[in-house]
């Protein structure tokens, strides 16, 4: 069984995906998009982003494989962050605050990122202002 653990966004080609994946159009937007994520993952696996258009970031848990699959849209419109604790546990969320509120997070300033930002006034790549917290890059999965 696959569960949506985290989701932020909107799938623009939802109607075509509902047709292709056999999902009821009359479901609420929230239920419909959850079903799209689950069925798209079951159908296309890691390649599901190739079939989806919109702005989204999400995490799916596959009970059978005991795997977490996280994906961010191709343009990076919706953010997705992750952090590995000292115990090797993966914390994740669509906001850094979600990660900060979880046990095991160590709040520490990323001085290297701060120096880059003050020099360039731009936050590039996967680094954030918190040490160990990374952004999932646009169009990438984890």
Where are the language model's segments positioned?
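Cysteine-centered catalytic environments shared across enzyme families
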Residues: 1-141
